[in-house]
Amino acid sequence: MQPMTRARIAVDAMGGDYAPDEIVAGALRASEELDADILLVGNPVPIQRYLDEHAPTAKPQIVAANDVVDMGEEPLSALKRKPKASINVAMDLVKAGAADAVVSAGHSGAAMAAALLRLGRLPGIDRPAIGAVLPTLLPGKSVLVLDVGANVDCRPKYLEQFAVMGSIYSQYVLDVENPKVGLLNIGEEDCKGNDLALKAHQLLRQNRQISFLGNAEGRDVLSGQFDVVVCDGFVGNVLLKFAESLGSVLVQILREELPRGWRGQLGTALLRPNLRKIKQRIDHAEHGGGLLLGVDGICIISHGSSQAPSIFNAIRLAKEAVDHRVSERIQACYQDAVAVEDQA
């Protein structure tokens, strides 16, 4: 399958703590640096005001959507009350074929619900999952963890599907040959874990569509041993939030431990290039957001506190998923897996 020449990304300009200014800023950078068409979805007045002040020559496409789902609202009821909310309109663009992907830093529950209501699940997929790319100890190597929040309660079958979807993403977007899959558990032994882990382990071991290495303990997730780690959304979200805190904790420790006075200033100056590289490896903003796998379209859910750099990276992530036809590959691979099981 050949990559699409130019991805069309619908950006929810009204979603997030710093909307619309930081969202528009990240989208403008993406329109300049990425081979993609950006559609800004939201209230045209503040969007245009920002453009007039900061990028008067820019001419991005603005799709009007005057409502927004606020963080404190219940997702389903808000989506029904506000059919013209920015996240609804963005999803409708994908459904109508006017866009290839959605990026939103708004209400994550609303983004997931809108994707399910507007786009629907891929045939054969029981539950979509949010996948987050995390850094590992090995330079240039990442690990995809899913689910990190879409499903707090899971069945063993769901985890098996997460592994299939994650393997496809890892292979085609992260360029990992034969991705190694691990099941997050409390021990390496096959007999360890609760009922969900034990039953999921059996399914993963039997699945011929993936390369299942076995159980992954918490200490193994960032070791580089695994390319894909699957778990339920409750555990995954806790893991994600913990991993996201590591960067700020490390920076704070370095600040406290560096000597004061001129020695500290000199040490900081000498270490600055290395500290910048460390930050790039561990900063969650570098990865942009989580990919909602299993819906009939590409949807990136960014952190609510995302600013322009994170939005840019989220759009880059969406473009990569579109170019590599992740949704189509998931559907095809899952259908192949079903056919193999039927023949067995």
Swiss-Prot record:
Pathway: Lipid metabolism; phospholipid metabolism. It is found in: Cytoplasm. GO terms for cellular component: cytoplasm. GO terms for molecular function: phosphate:acyl-[acyl carrier protein] acyltransferase activity. Its EC number is 2.3.1.274. InterPro entries: FA_synthesis, Phospholipid_synth_PlsX-like. SUPFAM superfamilies: Isocitrate/Isopropylmalate dehydrogenase-like. The keyword Ribonucleoprotein does not apply. Gene3D superfamilies: Isopropylmalate Dehydrogenase (3.40.718.10). GO terms for biological process: fatty acid biosynthetic process; phospholipid biosynthetic process. Its main location: cytoplasm. It catalyses: a fatty acyl-[ACP] + phosphate = an acyl phosphate + holo-[ACP]. Keywords: Cytoplasm, Lipid biosynthesis, Lipid metabolism, Phospholipid biosynthesis, Phospholipid metabolism, Transferase. Catalyzes the reversible formation of acyl-phosphate (acyl-PO(4)) from acyl-[acyl-carrier-protein] (acyl-ACP). This enzyme utilizes acyl-ACP as fatty acyl donor, but not acyl-CoA. Belongs to the PlsX family. HAMAP family: PlsX (MF_00019). NCBIfam families: plsX (TIGR00182). Homodimer. Probably interacts with PlsY. This is Phosphate acyltransferase. The gene is plsX.
